[in-house]
Amino acid sequence: MEGNAQIRIASRSVFGGVEDVIRLEGTATVEKTDYGWHLQYEAVNCEDEKSAVRSDIKLETDTRRAIVVNQGEGYGLLLDPAAVTATQIKTPQGSLTLNVKAKEVTWDLAGRKDGSVTLEYMLLVGMQPLSALRISLFLKK
């Protein structure tokens, strides 16, 4: 599924026992690479049509890992189901270091017209859960 596509995103997070679902729509570019797939997208929140997200995702076939860089938020994630990784998120008080425990990193981009990516992970302070997230991306040419 290389080339330009429309993207729909469902972002589900649970923080402090409260679930929040955000739906976004936009455009994406998908490229087959030596390591797997490279996906870049820009999407707008369907509810307020104001907040936008720009992300760059590298999907590694051999390791089944995802490297996610959220361009507007100023942080990146290494989602590796085989290991706990770490990230730093900028806050008004400075940088916050969080551990990242990936539960699911899957994708199906081999089709000509449709594709999908699922990223499910938990952010932890030390080893204490902070929030659980599941990002589902649906692509259509």
Q: What are the residue ranges of the model-derived segments?
A:
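N-terminal intrinsically disordered, cationic/polar leader segments
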Residues: 1-118, 128-130, 140
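Charged phosphate-binding loop/patch that engages nucleotide di/tri-phosphates or the phosphate backbone
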Residues: 133
